[in-house]
From Swiss-Prot:
Protein name as it appears in the record: Protein RecA
Location of the protein in the cell: Cytoplasm
PANTHER family cross-referenced by the UniProt entry: MITOCHONDRIAL DNA REPAIR PROTEIN RECA HOMOLOG-RELATED, RECA
Gene designation per UniProt: recA
GO molecular function, one term: ATP-dependent DNA damage sensor activity
Length: 338
């Protein structure tokens, strides 16, 4: 590329960033994420690294979508638990009226400190969300789910009435109002969304998310979460192998994919996730079926090695620290909760 063209493109990039903000455009091959982006860990180290900043960014809108029972709420609750560990406040707007408090507690959420709202209408849910964000004291706000944000007119109307585009209009208006105050308050707002099928699509992906197109534009990070296999112990299904694709990312290069295990009643397997990453980065050696770390054997087979690590949290923390060092991402600490 000639010097003049290089100069011209640099000028265009700087103008785009000036007008639309840092991260509006970036080179796909560039490894660097946006500098100094405060983030909250997701509970999965591999996903934290795929997001490029060590977790979901603060002061941004995040969308987590996928089919039913794919782990959307589990991932959102893990993020809420991580925010609480850092000394922050988490809120959960339960529009689906389906939050399982016992399960949230098992994932590490301090349920006594969790702010929970079960609104009657979509308008009420989004107004509550706006007031919580405006307070400036909430670190993570989860809205579960966009599909359950039913407009008041639809609730008060008859069962067969048509309400075309009402929910999309509601979301569009709410996001226009919310996006500015979310940025100022440094709150991470997570919208959980469901998948629908577009009718009559012959070519391309027939899947779409509910609530119109506004959320697709306003979200800084969009995560597509899918169950790809069942985890079995004998004949019993004890969990699922889950794949997450970073479909959109305005704080680091997108399109990265990760896989991790979600166990029923336990959530994301931290030890299994760290073990997979450590093998990938060459921190843990895998020879045949044996896993070894620092010359010592951890176990034979992945499951035995995972259970060995589960009983030794200090060893897990040590390996996790080395993974962060190799990845070149600073470890997220309590200092960021302020």
């Amino acid at each position: 590329m000639t010097q003049e063209r290089e100069k011209a493109i640099e000028l265009a990039l700087s103008q785009i960033e000036k007008q639309f903000g840092k991260g509006a455009i970036m080179r796909l091959g560039a490894d660097e994420a946006l500098p100094d982006v405060a983030a909250i860990p997701t509970g999965s180290l591999s996903l934290d690294l795929a997001l490029g900043v060590g977790g979901v960014p603060r002061g941004r809108i995040i969308e987590i979508y996928g089919p039913e029972s794919s782990g959307k709420t589990t991932l959102a609750l893990h993020i809420a638990a991580e925010a609480q560990k850092m000394g922050g406040i988490a809120a959960f707007v339960d529009a689906e009226h389906a939050l399982d408090i016992g399960y949230a507690r098992k994932l590490g959420v301090k349920t006594d400190d969790l702010l929970v709202s079960q609104p009657d209408t979509g308008e009420q849910a989004l107004e509550i969300a706006e007031m919580l964000v405006r307070s400036g004291a909430v670190d993570v706000l989860v809205i579960d789910s966009v599909a359950a944000l039913v407009p008041k007119a639809e609730i008060e109307g008859e069962m067969g009435d048509s309400h075309m585009g009402l929910q999309a209009r509601l979301m569009s208006q709410a996001l226009r109002k919310l996006t500015g105050i979310i940025s100022k308050s440094n709150c991470c707002v997570i919208f959980i969304n469901q998948i629908r099928m577009k009718i009559g699509v012959m070519f391309g992906n027939p899947e779409t998310t509910t609530g119109g197109n506004a959320l697709k534009f306003y979200a800084s990070v969009r995560l597509d979460i899918r169950k790809i296999a069942s985890l079995k112990q004998g004949q019993d299904v004890i969990g699922s192998r889950t794949k997450v694709k970073v479909v959109k990312n305005k704080v680091a290069p997108p399109f990265k994919e990760v896989e991790f295990d979600i166990y029923y009643g336990e959530g994301i397997s931290r030890e299994g996730d760290i073990l997979d990453l450590a093998v990938e980065k060459g921190i843990v050696d895998k020879s045949g079926a044996w896993f070894s770390y620092g010359g010592d054997r951890i176990g034979q087979g992945r499951e035995n090695s995972r259970l060995f690590l589960k009983e030794r949290p200090e060893l897990v923390n040590e390996i996790e620290g080395k993974v962060y060092d190799v990845a070149g991402i600073p470890r997220k600490g309590a200092k960021e909760a302020a």
